[in-house]
């Protein structure tokens, strides 16, 4: 499974959204209905899945599906 597929699966699992809703440009809060707690849990799930540490100032920038994919790809 590619990084993109793994990130999208985490988003589907964490936010309880349909896979087809998880488009690259989708915003977690505006498009996928996440709240601030959801985004914190999403970052924690990404850290666990990819065994990376995401500093708070970086986590704040991860607001869309593509930004999550890009962050993981650049920090693995």
From Swiss-Prot:
Pathways involved: Lipid metabolism; fatty acid biosynthesis
Entry coiled-coil feature ranges: none
Entry keywords, A to Z: Cytoplasm, Fatty acid biosynthesis, Fatty acid metabolism, Lipid biosynthesis, Lipid metabolism, Phosphopantetheine, Phosphoprotein
Biological processes, Gene Ontology terms: lipid A biosynthetic process
Key word Phosphoprotein present: yes
Record-level GO cellular component terms: cytosol; membrane
Cysteines paired by S-S bonds: none
Source species, domain of life: Bacteria
Predominant subcellular localization, coarse grouping: cytoplasm
Cellular compartments annotated: Cytoplasm
Domain Carrier: residue ranges: 1-76
Location of O-(pantetheine 4'-phosphoryl)serine modifications: 36
Maturation and modification: 4'-phosphopantetheine is transferred from CoA to a specific serine of apo-ACP by AcpS. This modification is essential for activity because fatty acids are bound in thioester linkage to the sulfhydryl of the prosthetic group.
Entry's Gene Ontology molecular function annotations: acyl binding; acyl carrier activity
Function, in words: Carrier of the growing fatty acid chain in fatty acid biosynthesis.
Family: Belongs to the acyl carrier protein (ACP) family.
Official protein name in the record: Acyl carrier protein
């Amino acid at each position: 499974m590619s990084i993109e597929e793994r990130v999208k699966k985490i988003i589907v699992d964490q936010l309880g959204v349909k896979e087809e809703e998880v488009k690259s440009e989708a915003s977690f809060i505006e498009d996928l209905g996440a709240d601030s707690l959801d985004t914190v849990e999403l970052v924690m799930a990404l850290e666990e899945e990819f065994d990376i540490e995401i500093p708070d100032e970086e986590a704040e920038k991860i607001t869309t599906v593509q930004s999550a994919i890009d962050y993981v790809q650049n920090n693995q």
